[in-house]
């Protein structure tokens, strides 16, 4: 009976240790789901490399992810693709294209993995400083989610600007043109 009790205690300890590790590994993913559900138009998600500066402004939520940028990007895009509320406009740093593998070993592999993790989404390139300025401006009025990864390669952060999922730029442009035409027609009505 004593041996059975030891086996039972050891089994329970191993099971709880295994479950604790599973919870620990999934914590960042749960946080991403929770925060992403609260974000909408004009909010931002940054999938950041390890040295990305900590943000202290209200409205910035930070999540530590024990993965590399491509894995976090893949996960975030899968979460966003499950909603019709928002779609990401994806910005990458212009500098990333020019960083050489000789100076940052692993950058070529990271770029390949990032391309795969993009799920076919188009990207826009901007200088990192311009992206940080856009992020700072957005954070004055809107929330930002920063997912800090373990990637230790320069200029590898990805910036997702959230747009309405059910309304695109073409629809907005057509609406504005129609409103402008209606306004112009009201201004040129004949005098009775």
Where do the model's predicted regions map?
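Metallocofactor- and cofactor-centric catalytic cores in central/energy metabolism, strongly enriched
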Residues: 22-23, 62
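N-terminal basic/disordered segments at the start of proteins
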Residues: 26-41, 151, 161
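Ordered, amphipathic secondary-structure segments that act as subunit-interaction surfaces
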Residues: 83-114
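Glycine-rich, aromatic-bearing surface loops/beta-hairpins
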Residues: 103-192
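Conserved mixed alpha/beta catalytic, RNA-binding, or beta-rich assembly cores of soluble enzyme
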Residues: 40-81, 168, 173-176, 181-191
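Bacterial N-terminal signal peptides
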Residues: 9-16
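Bacterial N-terminal signal peptides that target proteins for export
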Residues: 1-8
């Amino acid at each position: 009976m004593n041996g059975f009790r030891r086996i039972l205690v050891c089994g329970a300890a191993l099971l709880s240790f295994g479950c604790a590790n599973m919870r620990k590994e999934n914590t960042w993913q749960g946080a991403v789901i929770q925060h992403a559900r609260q974000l909408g138009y004009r909010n931002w998600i940054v999938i950041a490399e390890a040295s990305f500066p900590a943000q202290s402004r209200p409205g910035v939520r930070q999540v530590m992810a024990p993965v590399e940028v491509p894995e976090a990007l893949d996960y975030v895009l899968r979460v966003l693709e499950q909603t019709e509320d928002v779609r990401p406009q994806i910005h990458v740093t212009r500098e990333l294209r020019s960083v050489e593998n000789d100076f940052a070993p692993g950058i070529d592999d990271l770029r390949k993995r990032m391309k795969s993790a993009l799920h076919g989404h188009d990207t826009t390139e901007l200088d990192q400083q311009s992206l940080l300025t856009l992020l700072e401006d957005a954070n004055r009025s809107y929330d930002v989610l920063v997912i800090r990864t373990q990637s230790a390669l320069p200029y590898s952060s990805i910036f997702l600007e959230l747009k309405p999922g059910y309304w695109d730029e073409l629809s907005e442009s057509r609406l504005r043109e129609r409103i402008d035409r209606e306004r112009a027609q009201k201004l040129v009505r004949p005098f009775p």
